[in-house]
Amino acid sequence: MKHLALIGSTGSIGRQVLQVVRSIPDTFIIETLAAYGRNQEALISQIREFNPRVVAVREETTYKELRKLFPHIEILLGEEGLVSVATEPSVTMTIVASSGIDALPAVIAAIRQKKTIALANKESLVAAGELVTTLARENGVQILPIDSEHNALFQCLEGRDSSTIKKLLLTASGGPLRNKSKEELQKVSLQEVLRHPVWNMGPKITVDSSTLVNKGLEIIEAFWLFGLEAVEIEAVIHPQSLVHGMVEFCDGTILSVMNPPSMLFPIQHVLTFPERSPAIGPGFDFLSNRTLEFFPIDEDRFPSVHLAKRVLLEKGSMGCFFNGANEALVHRFLAGEISWHQIVPKLQALVDQHRVQSCLSLEEILSVDAEARARAQEC
């Protein structure tokens, strides 16, 4: 029996985590939940179904309402509540299904309490990869990736000699704008950006997918997650989104993980690891998926991946700054303050101006993040 903490329970990944939990009875217990969105009704339904020991929320109105409805459950508010959810003594696996850097203190606290980390929050590794992975090694904690690309790489790399690995390949659908010309990209609408051809995701990650910043973030995440200093990490466009990641070995062999474009597959793999359980949905059918296409990323139209590689080379505070500035720029786009085609040029200008510093502590990382967001609001 695995005892789970779930951060981000009402978001897209969180809801699918609970779908997997429902489908494999007598395997999991939901000990704690945290939901920092505004979907109060969904959270109430989850509490009634799973009866967690502890629940954490951000909104004070939600906090007060839950305390009235569930007097037998410990209801907590704010960042301290999030940390408590992640580190509850009965928990054996902390699932971080939320996006954004807000979950970072809880991730670090859970690692220090030696909880297995199931991670769908790429910002934790992009902004604080050195800190998070160092703490994980020191505490003997395993970080299991939920992101479909990193989960695919994890499965391909399991049990392999790192000296035999030549290249890691992440796949990208290309996002909702992949077929638009450079001229057309100058005038895309919010509706076009949010109309992803394959994945159903939240607005922030959908915008990141459209700029391919998401793939840049994933390259940085893969570097910290797998710790393969000398191994090349690349991304390729794969419109069908059936191959999620590939590992090329020194002898020319390539291993890949293939499944339909559903997050249920990597979520189930992580939750049941190191065991495997029957899939809760239909798997990959070669006869109905006979076309697999791969294309290089057009860096002229989508320069963000090249920018992310530069960020990775500089290390230090650069990843944190890159992540924070991008998130603020995306929110400005969603609010109608800037156009889509301004996001990456503004991000590149901010990165050019940032003076890299060492980021060893949580406090330093959060300070750089705040600086990045403030500067992105002003540019």
UniProtKB/Swiss-Prot annotation:
It catalyses: 2-C-methyl-D-erythritol 4-phosphate + NADP(+) = 1-deoxy-D-xylulose 5-phosphate + NADPH + H(+). Keywords: Isoprene biosynthesis, Manganese, Metal-binding, NADP, Oxidoreductase. GO terms for biological process: isopentenyl diphosphate biosynthetic process, methylerythritol 4-phosphate pathway involved in terpenoid biosynthetic process. Its EC number is 1.1.1.267. The gene is dxr. Belongs to the DXR family. It comes from Chlamydia trachomatis serovar D (strain ATCC VR-885 / DSM 19411 / UW-3/Cx). Pathway: Isoprenoid biosynthesis; isopentenyl diphosphate biosynthesis via DXP pathway; isopentenyl diphosphate from 1-deoxy-D-xylulose 5-phosphate: step 1/6. InterPro entries: DXP_reductoisomerase (IPR003821), DXP_reductoisomerase_C (IPR013644), DXP_reductoisomerase_N (IPR013512), DXPR_C (IPR026877), DXPR_C_sf (IPR036169), NAD(P)-bd_dom_sf (IPR036291). This is 1-deoxy-D-xylulose 5-phosphate reductoisomerase. One of its GO terms (molecular function) is manganese ion binding. 1-deoxy-D-xylulose 5-phosphate binds at residues 122, 148-149, 173, 196, 209, 214-215, 218.
